[in-house]
Structure formats: structure tokens, C-alpha cells
């Protein structure tokens, strides 16, 4: 497997020593980025599945906690996220043609873990959108010994009164080739860049919000 060096922002990651982020290609040619951290005498490897609008460096602190416990980690920029290839010209839109396309990224990530000889057994820690991706991966036979899900996206909460409209809009926009457009009422900028800590709905940890 060809693992070409990719940009890696160690000062942003605040992760364990020896961080790096190679490029790799999914089976359909989409270029993605992974980030491994490996302590000496590791007891196994945790596959970190990020959520939407997240990226390798954001998991540096999580990797550091696991590193101190003698676990290697590897995380990923999903297609449309971080520094991975985009499906649309506007890099701010993390569009995918089909949600199952993420399984191609998972397969490439596992191949990278094997090529890097990351220690077994493998474990999975999946957050938000990564939880949705991770659940399908488990169903399809992801070779992990144990799993942790953090706020997994196993559904999208929609008020019962607006649900039929949302379903019709979602189906209809895809039918006419407009499935890449933002839903009404949403913003193109990432939530964390537009909401102050006091008003945010994602975390009660001020240090992590600032990080």
C-alpha cells in the first residue's frame, strides 16, 4: 500500500509524540488522510471515527489519553472533511454521493492500519456521524474486539409536523439533481465557528470548546 506523506499540524493536534498523517486512496480513487500515533509496547489499536466537520488533528488529545494507557490510535479525514478530497467545488460542503461511500474510507483505513503494522487487537471509538459509519462497519464485519460510541448519529431528529416535508424535500432534491444543496435553515459555516461557548449545544467543556 502506497502511503505518501501528507500535511500534519502537530501544534494544532496537541497529541502524542511522533504524529504524522499519510495520504491514501480509497477503492474509488478518493484521496483521504489518516493519522496514527503509536506508543512503545502498545496493547492494541483504537480506530477513532470522527464526526462531521472534524479532522485528524482534532483527535490529538483523545489520542494522547489513549497513548498514556498504552494504546495506539489511528484516525481519519473522511471524504469531504478535513484535508480529504471534496465531491463539490465548494470545500466547505462535506457532500457525499451516498452515505455508504464512507465504507470505502473505512476499508482504506483498516488497510493502512495493517500496512503500518499497528498492534492488534483493534478497537473502535466512534463519535457522532462516525458512530453512524461505525455501526454499518460493524454490521459489515469490521474486525474490532470492543466498541465505544459517543453521541452516535443513529437518527436525525425532526419535529413530527415537519417530517413529511423534510422527507419530500430530501427525496425530491435528489431526484432533480440538487441533493448537494444545503437544507433550508442551515448555514454553510461550521457550527463551532459561529456559536460562542455560552450558547453552544455541543459541549459543556470550555477548554475543549476553545481547543
How should these model regions be labeled?
Residues 1-26, 30-38:
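An N-terminal hydrophobic leader/cap segment in hydrolases
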Residues 56, 63-89:
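Conserved alpha/beta-hydrolase
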